[in-house]
């Protein structure tokens, strides 16, 4: 098995499939294995899988277990809903709710793969062409192992190369990702730099007219991860997804906000700006696998971050890919079709719900007040997502 892409999804696939006996080779086009970005939330559906891979202790050493998630109004500062996490996640779903920094999770996966010796990791390697026929697949590119020029009939390729995937074109007709009109300003600051009375032990989601902000501790509570999503035109270059963010532009886009939120954001010395892009929810298994080629994570189903499940769905994909690959009684094509059939509907549902959540977060006028009243009245049952956390 060849895995294209050495991010969180690619390494998760390598670890899971390596444990299933696949002996995967990971091809990463960068010169070093690294992960940039900010924090991620991992619901119990994700941590349950990571624990099954033997990473429970590793997660404790890098992550943070928030007690609860508070939803607040950006203008009044009032708590409009609370979802208990912490012990409730363990009692209800059998696994914890974690917040981590992407780079820390990436490092843990990389360390586990290297210590197991069950996968080969190759840097500075880029797949540029592929031919598939009844006998196998042939790959061309830069700095590839000679053995990849003629792959055996048992060979498969998994595209885990993200939103701007180069391998996606071998499964579905090439189309550009969709520009959402949303901008994410992200930052990571030492918790000590936040005013003491505002330091967090929980996840805070602030919702307001055309804006929302998500704040939570990472790195065992030593840092605060901040994400503010506003509406606005994208930067000129979308291929370069990470840009310097202008603080004045952010403040103008947010409009009036409560003093507590304003004081927390004031502790940020510099912002990074990410234009949010996605694709329409996938419509069937044919968008995740074709012949001996499969797609995983953002290469298959990029999603908006409003359900906090982008990395989670890639990790779930990896676990299902390993289960399907272990079916040695099936041909390679049938194993990949089994994987795609098992995953496409859940991924589509998460994509759809993520879009809907973003719309709810940004409601204005009477609809905003209606949302707030509904959340106050219904509280936890409205905020919990058992169909997601109890799965897959």
Predicted segments, located by residue:
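Alpha-helical membrane-targeting segments
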Residues: 352, 356-392
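Flavin-binding catalytic cores
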Residues: 239-272, 332, 340-341
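Active-site substrate-recognition segment that forms the wall
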Residues: 201-236, 243-247, 251-255, 276
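Histidine-centered metal-chelating micro-motifs
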Residues: 165, 184-186, 211-214, 300-301
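Conserved N-terminal helical subregion
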Residues: 1, 18, 43-190, 234-253, ...
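Short, flexible helix/strand-to-coil boundary loops that buttress conserved ligand/catalytic motifs
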Residues: 37, 53-54, 63, 83-84, ...
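Conserved mid-domain beta->alpha element of the FAD-binding
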Residues: 2-31, 158-159, 215, 249-250, ...
């Amino acid at each position: 098995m060849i895995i294209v892409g050495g991010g969180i999804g690619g390494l998760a696939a390598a670890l899971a499939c390596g444990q299933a006996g696949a002996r995967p080779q990971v091809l990463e086009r960068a010169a070093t294995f690294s992960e940039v970005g900010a924090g991620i939330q991992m619901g119990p559906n994700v941590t349950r899988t990571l624990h099954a891979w033997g990473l429970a202790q590793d997660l404790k050493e890098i992550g943070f277990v928030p007690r609860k998630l508070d939803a607040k109004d950006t203008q009044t500062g009032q708590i409009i809903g609370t979802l208990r996490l912490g012990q409730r996640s363990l009692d209800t779903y059998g696994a914890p709710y974690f917040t981590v920094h992407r780079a820390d999770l990436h490092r843990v996966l990389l360390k586990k793969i290297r210590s197991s010796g069950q996968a080969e990791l190759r840097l500075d390697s880029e797949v540029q062409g592929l031919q598939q026929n009844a006998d196998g697949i042939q790959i061309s590119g830069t700095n590839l192992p000679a053995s990849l020029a003629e792959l055996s009939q048992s060979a498969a390729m998994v595209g885990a190369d993200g939103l701007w995937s180069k391998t996606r074109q071998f499964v579905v007709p090439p189309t550009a990702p969709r520009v959402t009109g949303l901008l994410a300003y992200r930052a990571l600051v030492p918790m000590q730099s936040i005013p003491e009375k505002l330091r967090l032990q929980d996840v805070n989601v602030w919702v307001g007219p055309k804006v929302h902000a998500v704040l939570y501790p990472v790195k065992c509570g030593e840092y605060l991860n901040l994400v503010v999503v506003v509406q606005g035109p994208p930067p000129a270059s979308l291929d370069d997804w990470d840009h310097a963010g202008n603080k004045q532009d952010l403040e103008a886009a947010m409009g009036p906000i409560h003093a507590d939120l304003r004081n927390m954001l004031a502790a940020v010395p510099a912002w990074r700006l990410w234009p949010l892009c996605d694709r329409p929810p996938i419509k069937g298994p044919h968008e995740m696998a074709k012949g001996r080629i499969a797609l995983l994570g953002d290469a298959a189903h990029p999603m908006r971050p409003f359900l906090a499940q982008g990395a989670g769905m890639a990790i779930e994909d990896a676990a299902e890919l390993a289960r399907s690959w272990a079916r040695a009684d099936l041909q390679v094509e049938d194993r990949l079709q089994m994987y795609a059939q098992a995953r496409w509907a859940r991924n589509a549902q998460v994509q759809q719900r993520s879009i809907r959540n973003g719309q709810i977060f940004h409601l204005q006028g009477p609809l905003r007040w209606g949302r707030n009243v509904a959340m106050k009245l219904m509280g936890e049952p409205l905020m919990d997502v058992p169909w997601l956390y109890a799965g897959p």
